[in-house]
Amino acid sequence: MAHILMKQLLEAGVHFGHQTKRWCPKMKEYIFSERNGIHIIDLQKTLVKLEEAYEFAKEQAKEGKTFLFVGTKKQAQQTIEEEAKRCGAFYVNQRWLGGMLTNFTTIKSRIDYMVKLEELKNNGYFEKLPKKQANRLNRELEKLVKVFDGLRGIEKLPDVLYIVDPKREEIAVKEANKLGIPIIAIVDTNCDPELITYPIPGNDDAIRSIKLITSKIADAILEGKDLREKEADLQLKDEDLQSEIS
């Protein structure tokens, strides 16, 4: 993993958990202490878990797997979009619709419909319609783009989910677990880490904390993709060499 220092975690406030009265007892092993009614997360354990999640994401990307980043809380929306785009992942950062995974066929048809409406609009079709009908289609398109913009081009269920605040995104967690899709997630002190395949103990409310951890997962995906490309290049060179020999 690209070197990350304890100092970076501290500066980003990754160690600040929730109020002690809001904790999940299953997070006990990741809690270092309590200060002024707030749980303090053990950053040594955060580093270990972040390393595990990084290696998993890297290996999955190396195998050509697809990722879906999920984070609809205000503090996460911008980071989720930026980091997903940077590493070529799909993303949901506005609203998780029930069935996005478990009813994927219907969701895919809505995404296709959004793309079709955009094509019609860009080709000037809306301008030929009565104003009332054109306005209705424009409003419908705006709603579709808001929800599905980060899922353009998705053809099948994602292979891995990365989630900011799995307690808030509990429907996404349930759907992924039902389908056996592995989850990487930032788990704050109020979350159940047993629902997550690769939990990363950390502050899921502070923008800097979300940005730091999310960027590391994106880095892992990019590193895995780079390794995949290099292996493909080596294979091509070997095939060329074999054909020359024969």
From Swiss-Prot:
Protein name from the UniProt record: Small ribosomal subunit protein uS2
A single BP term in Gene Ontology: translation
Superkingdom of the source species: Bacteria
Family the UniProt entry places it in: Belongs to the universal ribosomal protein uS2 family.
Species of provenance: Dictyoglomus thermophilum (strain ATCC 35947 / DSM 3960 / H-6-12)
Record gene name: rpsB
PANTHER family membership: 30S RIBOSOMAL PROTEIN S2 PROKARYOTIC AND ORGANELLAR, SMALL RIBOSOMAL SUBUNIT PROTEIN US2M
UniProt cross-references to InterPro entries, sorted A to Z: Ribosomal_uS2, Ribosomal_uS2_bac/mit/plastid, Ribosomal_uS2_CS, Ribosomal_uS2_flav_dom_sf
Gene Ontology cellular-component annotations: cytosolic small ribosomal subunit
PROSITE patterns hit by this protein: RIBOSOMAL_S2_1
GO molecular function: structural constituent of ribosome
Keywords: Ribonucleoprotein, Ribosomal protein
HAMAP family on file: Ribosomal_uS2_B (MF_00291_B)
